[in-house]
């Protein structure tokens, strides 16, 4: 690879996958109320447990200076850069990366492309993974950019939060809305729009209806024949995926990579979340020669039996109005 792909830990790919794909990753810190970074020392499960005990966590944003320092490292080596960022509709990291790109290009004769994923969580992870895999398998700089254009446009997300107390405790919904929603078992179905912003798409009562609604929404928005994998996601309760996997199988999907939500999203919405990411169209044939390893070093799951490690992260719910 004559260029470097840079992303950040909000894509939530596990360390083994990152190492295999030779991706450069910015670390987003997850700090407790005392400012201590716990993302290195605690597993997702341990952080979920702390949250249920009443602890709160915050996440950081990658600064202009951090991007500049990282870019300079590769610029000094003469290495071209493709930098993927969390959606500009959710975070200021894209703007910070663009400012750093401008300064680097004034000093060094290298190519720097900043790609706004317009995605969050598993969608961002999916984009990062396929781009890294293509580069690992010999795709050129321009071919990876071409693939990224497709992935950014076709990546879709559907998810729900089934306990709003964490959104309330984080100041993102009112006490009244959280109480009413939990008492009446009302679940918000959330998606990410074309500008990379999270929005309330539907409201349903109960998990069973949420599974059905997610499938209906997916059916409306995809022309995929099911040959590309779907990425179901969960946090603290893996059992929530059983009905989701079954409904996907009933629709002809048989390739799944079940993913654990990372701690960064949990800092904003809590551990009570599930959903999926998918492509609205099949991956074009011209890219598939670079994606023959699909799910590098990981298993394709036909049944919900074993689950790959974390791949999914960061939904910034600031200013999100659920109702």
Show which residues each predicted segment covers.
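Short beta-strand/turn micro-motifs composed of small residues
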Residues: 7, 85, 234
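A glycine-rich beta-strand to alpha-helix segment
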Residues: 85, 113-114
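N-terminal glycine-rich anion-binding loop in soluble enzyme alpha/beta folds
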Residues: 3-62, 66
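N-terminal glycine-rich phosphate/adenylate-binding segment common to multiple enzyme folds
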Residues: 66-97
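Mixed-charge interfacial surface used for oligomerization/domain docking
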Residues: 10-24, 29-31, 90-93, 97-102, ...
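Generic beta-sheet signal
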Residues: 3, 79-83, 228-230
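Positively charged N-terminal leader segments that act as targeting/secretion signals
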Residues: 299-316, 322
């Amino acid at each position: 690879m004559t260029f470097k792909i840079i992303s950040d830990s909000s894509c939530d790919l596990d360390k083994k996958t990152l190492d295999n794909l030779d991706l450069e990753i910015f670390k987003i810190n997850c700090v407790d109320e005392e400012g201590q970074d716990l993302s290195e020392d605690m597993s997702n499960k341990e952080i979920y447990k702390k949250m249920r005990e009443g602890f709160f966590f915050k996440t950081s944003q990658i600064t202009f200076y951090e991007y500049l320092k990282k870019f300079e490292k590769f610029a000094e080596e003469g290495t071209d850069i493709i930098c993927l960022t969390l959606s500009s509709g959710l975070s200021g990291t894209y703007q910070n990366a663009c400012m750093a790109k401008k300064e680097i290009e004034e000093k060094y004769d290298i190519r720097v492309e900043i790609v706004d994923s317009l995605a969050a969580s598993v969608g961002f992870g999916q984009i990062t993974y396929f781009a890294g895999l293509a580069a690992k398998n010999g795709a050129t700089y321009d071919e990876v950019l071409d693939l990224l254009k497709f992935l950014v446009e076709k990546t879709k997300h559907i998810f729900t939060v089934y306990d709003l107390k964490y959104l309330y405790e984080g100041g993102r919904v009112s006490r009244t809305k959280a109480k009413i929603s939990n008492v009446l078992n009302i679940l918000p179905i959330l998606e990410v729009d074309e500008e990379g912003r999270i929005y309330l798409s539907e409201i349903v009562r109960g998990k069973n209806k949420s599974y059905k609604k997610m499938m209906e929404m997916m059916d409306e928005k995809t022309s995929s024949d099911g040959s590309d994998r779907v990425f179901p996601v969960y946090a603290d309760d893996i059992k929530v995926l059983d009905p989701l996997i079954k409904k996907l199988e009933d629709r002809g999907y048989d390739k799944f990579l079940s993913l654990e939500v990372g701690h960064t999203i949990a800092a904003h919405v809590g551990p009570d979340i599930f959903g999926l990411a998918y492509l609205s169209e099949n991956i074009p044939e011209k890219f598939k020669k670079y994606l023959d390893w699909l799910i590098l070093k990981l298993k394709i799951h036909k049944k919900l039996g074993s689950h790959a490690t974390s791949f999914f992260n960061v939904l910034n719910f600031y200013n999100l109005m659920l109702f």
